[in-house]
Amino acid sequence: MNSTNPMTGPKVLHANLKRGRLEVEVNASTFAAQALFDFAERRNPKRAFLFVSRVLGRHIPARPSLMAQSFNALAGKIPADLPGPVLVIGMAETAVGLGAGVHRALSQTRNDCVYLYSSRHP
């Protein structure tokens, strides 16, 4: 994951799936989109695809140092002078781990961080 060359123009990523072609247009990104995620197929009539993270280690193995780098990069986007407390929310599935990692990284520099998570299941 290298942020020294942020993306400046639109880039179209695509995947040829059994149920059709999926295209994603990325207009701006600090990191190269293909370094962050890939596409996967699902056997689900409501949504035949899944975006899988290359940096979270859930579906594709990732080095812990890469995971920490992504959490630190996201936490670094939160203004240091933001009035607290700061609430970080992980909403269902993969975002629960992402939120926990961002909270942990943010807690290195702030003592007023709170983390909440939710599930899509009751």
Please report, for each region that a protein language model flagged, where it lies by residue.
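PRPP-associated nucleotide enzymes
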Residues: 1-122
